[in-house]
Amino acid sequence: MSRDIFMKRLRLHLLFDEVAMVTHIVGDVLSSVLLCAVVLLVLVGNTLVVAAVATSRKLRTVTNVFIVNLACADLLLGVLVLPFSAVNEIKDVWIFGHVWCQVWLAVDVWLCTASILNLCCISLDRYLAITRPIRYPGLMSAKRAKTLVAGVWLFSFVICCPPLIGWNDGGDGIMDYNGTTATPIPVTTTQTPVTGRDDVLCDNGFNYSTNSNMNTTCTYSGDSSLSTTCELTNSRGYRIYAALGSFFIPMLVMVFFYLQIYRAAVKTISAYAKGELKTKYSVRENGSKTNSVTLRIHRGGRGPSTGSSVYRHGSTYGGSAAGAATREGCGDKDAAGGRRFGRQEMDSHLPVRKCRSSDASLVTLTGLKCEIIDNGNAKHGPISELIKGRGKSFFWRKEKKRSVGGERESFENSTRNGRSTRAKLCGGRCLAIETDICSSGECSPRTKRIKEHARATQHNSLPVTPSLSSQNEETDAVFVRGTSNSEYKPRRSRLSAHKPGHAMRLHMQKFNREKKAAKTLAIIVGAFIMCWMPFFTIYLVGAFCENCISPIVFSVAFWLGYCNSAMNPCVYALFSRDFRFAFRKLLTCSCKAWSKNRSFRPQTSDVPAIQLHCATQDDAKSSSDIGPTASGGNGGYT
């Protein structure tokens, strides 16, 4: 009878063992598939990022220096750390020896910290690009970017090296970067089961045997010399040091930079909303039709926007100005007060660089008032009084533009009722000049050639490239439409001016690209916090409470941090058109042909050229060709 009971218990015990074994196998298979998928995503995704930048010159920007460095850190993590972590997680025992345990853990923290600090550098780069667009090329040059990259790797090593030189919890085992100990596992252990049950299971990698006394003996089935486990040490000081240096301080830095980027975005949108004011009407003066000036101000600097007040006060006069025939030089002072101006002073006047001339007269347009210097005699007063009977001219200014080619100049000529207009960029800003070219109906041969050239080209616009670029260019620009009572209607060119709101739309399109980059940065930072916050929180809690965290929770948080290295390339592919295009080309094996067909364009090539024309409302549908000196290839000036 007792023997039958013993056999029933034995069969029940074997059934429980089989169920537990099947469950354990299924769990191992699912864990293996999931962990292998993470490892493959890290390897493939970051390899694509590095290959995309290597094969596309368009992607070789300063920002992408940090992105490539981030991808390299994650790629090395996928090669040197993750495969061993996956095996250790699945087998639940370290089988690669004591020495590699130490190296593996040190490399793990080094690469993880480098990945986190690279995200911090990307946030810094975007912060400078968006909040300081003019100074950005000087602040974040290629040399400084490489210096930051070197600093990332050096600081990461400083975080991982203290345990290697003795900062640990005093244990006898091998210390890793976090002070983990590699402890040998006993070859055999004896466990006493619960009374009446003999379903004790051994750890993974051990075999069990049950004797007649119902005691279970677990015996390691592998090489006893390799049976080690790498466990985190309880060195409280180092855990705090590593958690702050590897995660919490970089996280605060990234959050600060992103908040500043968000504030800059909101501020710029508000400035554009205030600057997009339009006045369209006409008045009768002495029986002739006079059109009002339409002025837009786009502000990109600090301080409150004053563009709208400038517009309201300066949009009621009809703007026409006569000027000098010969330009000899440019000054650095504004026309009204003889002093430099700030962006916040636009509500009082519209500054330009005064162009000195050797003869005739010079006109400088400054807000409500105009100054005419006629053969050395200066006259001040409203524009409508000073320009009566002088015909049509126009004025516009553009802040200095930094570009690869440096400062450029552009000229234009046009003919209005026997008068020639010639405009030239003056130190980055432009003043339109109008002069008489014929006297008593007689024109010199040179003058005739000028007139013929003017009629042939009929220039009435100057190309400019104002933008919100975070890389190279200033964002202040003022556009003024002049007035005329002439019947001049130049022919339209496909490169000429567009409708009044076109410039604003182009500005906003460029700014939308900047907002998209900021949104991508927000997603990257959010993914970073979501992935690493659980692990480092548990890591700190473990320093004060050893048994508060279950092994399963620790493993999930541990691998969630690794998932961040797999998510970064996915974010680039989803939100970056250039990276998405490069990935598609690489995956379709057409990288070589694509690289040959793609010509190099600097990062500012995305900025569209804006052609502005100067015409009355009667001529709203008219515009002219771009002059022979204007470059249509890059949206700039020759």
UniProtKB/Swiss-Prot annotation:
Protein's membrane topology: Multi-pass membrane protein
One GO location term (cellular component): synapse
Domain of life of the source: Eukaryota
Keywords per UniProt: Cell membrane, Disulfide bond, G-protein coupled receptor, Glycoprotein, Membrane, Receptor, Transducer, Transmembrane, Transmembrane helix
Transmembrane intervals: 29-53, 65-87, 103-124, 148-167, 240-259, 521-545, 552-575
Cytoplasmic side: 54-64, 125-147, 260-520, 576-638
Tissue-wise expression: Expressed in the central nervous system.
Pfam families named in the record: 7tm_1
UniProt topological domain (Extracellular) ranges: 1-28, 88-102, 168-239, 546-551
Localisation per UniProt entry: Cell membrane
Purpose of the protein: G-protein coupled receptor for octopamine (OA), which is a neurotransmitter, neurohormone, and neuromodulator in invertebrates. Activation of this receptor by octopamine induces an increase in both inositol phosphates and cyclic AMP. The coupling to adenylyl cyclase seems to be less efficient than the coupling to phospholipase C. The rank order of potency for agonists is p-synephrine >= clonidine > p-octopamine = xylometazoline = phenylephrine = oxymetazoline > B-HT920 > serotonin = p-tyramine > epinephrine > norepinephrine > methoxamine = dopamine = histamine.
Family, similarity comment: Belongs to the G-protein coupled receptor 1 family.
Entry protein name: Octopamine receptor 1
Organism: Lymnaea stagnalis
